[in-house]
UniProtKB/Swiss-Prot annotation:
It catalyses: L-glutamate = D-glutamate. Pfam families: Asp_Glu_race. The keyword Thylakoid does not apply. Pathway: Cell wall biogenesis; peptidoglycan biosynthesis. It comes from Bartonella bacilliformis (strain ATCC 35685 / KC583 / Herrer 020/F12,63). This is Glutamate racemase. Substrate binds at D10, S11, Y42, G43, N75, T76, T190, H191. Belongs to the aspartate/glutamate racemases family. Its EC number is 5.1.1.3. InterPro entries: Asp/Glu/hydantoin_racemase, Asp/Glu_race, Asp/Glu_racemase_AS_1, Asp/Glu_racemase_AS_2, Glu_race. Keywords: Cell shape, Cell wall biogenesis/degradation, Isomerase, Peptidoglycan synthesis. One of its GO terms (biological process) is regulation of cell shape.
Length: 271
């Protein structure tokens, strides 16, 4: 591949929320979307085992591609090992996806913030450091869901989901404290924005849901300005999607077509 693509990585299809925004801002670049669906969901993995897995995926991936930049479009992976990836592959810029706690603290009026994430992101030291640095004057409720990422995968593919279960998963985000109510909820998993219309319907009261996808896309673009200087707008750029399981059903294939992604099979990720 002659192009230096921008690689987007996630455990599943959640990172498509970020890819979609990036392609709006930088359509002239080539994108490769990599989903470690064989390891999905990441939220319940033991940290050391998951670290080893992600490192192995990238070691094999970067034998195939020399990317202009890699976006870790996964909060669980980013909070776990964005520093490790930067250290292991110092010649490649990495952009992480971390809970938008700083933005939430700036927006809240009640001082009550909730972070809706996976169990892995909730327990991560990185997440707690963000709270200490940017929201130490707020009450921050950390809510780790084991089910929502899977709900999002199913919903996006057109499969039915249990709305009562979904409601049960988000209820802990709605906190009343001393007559004040949660007014900002951070979507700290890239899968969750796919469920935003359902969240609105199941919410106990109106809140501001923060989806960081646009901010990540803007940051990605800012780092690629030099790369884009010599690029002309091409109409026939081919963007690709790779899945570690190699098992892509018809529904997933049709979904990827909506995102203008061509499926590439036969890549050995070593996992």
């Amino acid at each position: 591949m002659s192009e230096k693509p921008v690689i987007f990585f996630d455990s599943g299809i959640g990172g498509l929320t970020v890819l979609k925004e990036a392609r709006i801002l930088i359509p002239e670049l080539q994108f490769v979307y990599v989903a470690d669906d064989a390891g999905f969901p990441y939220g319940a993995w033991e940290e050391d085992v998951l670290k080893g897995r992600i490192l192995k995926v990238f070691t094999n991936l970067l034998k195939l591609y020399t990317p202009a930049l890699c976006v870790i479009a996964c909060n669980t992976a980013s909070t776990l090992m964005i520093s490790d990836l930067r250290q292991e592959f110092p010649h490649i810029p990495f952009v992480g996806t971390v809970p938008a706690i700083k933005s939430a603290a700036a927006q809240t009026k009640s001082g009550l913030i909730s972070v809706l994430a996976t169990p892995g992101t909730v327990k991560r030291a990185y997440t707690h450091e963000l709270i200490s640095s940017f929201a130490n004057q707020c009450h921050v409720e950390l809510v780790g869901s084991k089910k929502l990422a899977t709900f999002a995968e199913n919903y996006l593919r057109g499969y039915p989901i249990d709305y009562e279960e979904l409601r049960h998963e988000i209820l802990p985000c709605f906190v009343e404290k001393n007559g004040k109510y949660t007014d900002v909820i951070v979507l700290a998993c890239t899968h969750y924005p796919f469920l935003i219309s359902l969240f609105h319907k199941q919410a106990l009261w109106s809140v501001n849901w923060i989806d960081p996808a646009k901010a990540i896309a803007r940051h990605t673009r800012s780092l690629l300005l030099e790369t884009m200087k010599n690029k002309s707008s091409k109409k026939n750029i081919k963007n690709y999607a790779l899945f570690t399981s190699q098992n892509i059903d018809f529904v997933t294939e049709r979904l990827l077509q909506r995102f203008n992604l061509n499926i590439m099979k036969g890549v050995d990720f070593g996992v």
